[in-house]
Amino acid sequence: MTGLIYNQHDIPKDVYRYGLRPSAQTGCGWIATYNALKLLGCTTDIPELIRYFTWQLPVIHGNLGTAFWAPRQCFRKWGFDTELIFDRRRFDEKAAEADAGIVFYHWAGKRGTGAHFVALQKTPEGFTGYNTFRNSTGPDCWGTSVDGFLRQHRYFGCVLLCIRKK
């Protein structure tokens, strides 16, 4: 799969700003949406996608990132069948049934706390995430369990968006 964004920190600070900040800081929501669209075989104009999120579904116009429900609103508007899953025990089953997914989670560490979006897909090897880590250079192997990966990394407050093709 080409054209995916593997690491938002590789986006130059003056390219693809999200609100008043660079996408490298707060752009994971639109990036996960973009990557999920690519996984679904769709194309989109990045500046147009950013404008959509910045003015219609922002958290303070993108300055604090994207609300967890915003990508679902986009995919529903575009005619995709979507489902939000809040019970992590159902993540593996539901993610395996989806054509693409987006996981939203919170993290805590030395740098404080924050939240992140990652595009996800089921592959023959297990689950693969895109733009998972600060040092990601390509697709990230999540293993055979989405829930297991999230638990291993101590991520919390997780929501899975399952997306099925039109």
Question: Where on the chain are the PLM-derived regions?
Answer:
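Conserved active-site-adjacent core of cysteine acyl-enzyme catalytic domains
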Residues: 2, 43-165
